């Protein structure tokens, strides 16, 4: 089924089986860790400040497959200096066969990022620890609420995640 979905053709048996949502591939698209002020930052007694940015992009690969990229940038500063910047883009290819556009939109905006998020959490934590800093655990994110907010914003535009190349922010 994987080759058929990635090549844009659903097998006749799949169509007869009804709607399908499949995980075709999960992979790291991009990863970066910088600690520009190490090792001096390890002795900084200032309270660290964290800034988290989250972004989701969706790209239609063909009629039955979509790439979803969940991007997280975590910036830690202490005493006005950057302690570290961790950037992760975790991606997945998802097969969506026999579903109406609204169901596809909901799955792309909620289920797919929920599937990718544990991978992002682990990678961010591992990067930060490998950089010599205490572990940081991303807290759960309510992608359903983010999707509902995004949906309200898009209703006036008449767009959907499935129709767009990159879908923008989540």
UniProtKB/Swiss-Prot annotation:
Q: What is its main location?
A: cytoplasm
Per UniProt, subcellular location reads as: Cytoplasm
Domain of life from the UniProt record: Bacteria
A GO molecular-function annotation? unfolded protein binding
Could you tell me the Gene Ontology terms of the biological process aspect for this record? protein folding; protein tetramerization; protein transport
Instruction: Return the GO cellular component terms, semicolon-separated.
Output: cytoplasm
- Pfam families the record matches: SecB
Entry keyword set: Chaperone, Cytoplasm, Protein transport, Translocation, Transport
Transport in keyword set? yes
Q: Which family does it belong to?
A: Belongs to the SecB family.
Q: Which PANTHER family match?
A: PROTEIN-EXPORT PROTEIN SECB, PTHR36918
Complex formation: Homotetramer, a dimer of dimers. One homotetramer interacts with 1 SecA dimer.
Q: Sum up the protein's function in the record's words.
A: One of the proteins required for the normal export of preproteins out of the cell cytoplasm. It is a molecular chaperone that binds to a subset of precursor proteins, maintaining them in a translocation-competent state. It also specifically binds to its receptor SecA.
What is this protein's name? Protein-export protein SecB
The species is: Xanthomonas euvesicatoria pv. vesicatoria (strain 85-10) (Xanthomonas campestris pv. vesicatoria)
Name the gene.
secB
């Amino acid at each position: 089924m994987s080759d058929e979905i990635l090549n844009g053709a659903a097998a006749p048996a799949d169509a007869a089986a009804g709607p399908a949502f499949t995980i075709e591939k999960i992979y790291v698209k991009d990863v970066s860790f910088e600690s520009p002020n190490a090792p001096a930052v390890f002795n900084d007694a200032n309270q660290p400040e964290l800034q988290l940015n989250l972004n989701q992009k969706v790209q239609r690969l063909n009629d039955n497959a979509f790439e979803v990229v969940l991007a997280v940038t975590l910036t830690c500063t202490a005493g006005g200096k950057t302690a570290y910047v961790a950037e992760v883009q975790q991606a997945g290819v998802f097969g969506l066969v026999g579903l109406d556009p609204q169901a596809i939109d909901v799955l792309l905006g909620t289920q797919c990022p929920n599937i990718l998020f544990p991978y992002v959490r682990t990678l961010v934590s591992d990067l930060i620890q490998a950089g010599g800093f205490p572990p940081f655990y991303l807290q759960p994110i309510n992608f359903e609420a983010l999707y509902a907010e995004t949906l309200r914003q898009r209703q006036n535009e008449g767009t959907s995640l499935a129709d767009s190349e990159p879908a923008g922010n989540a």
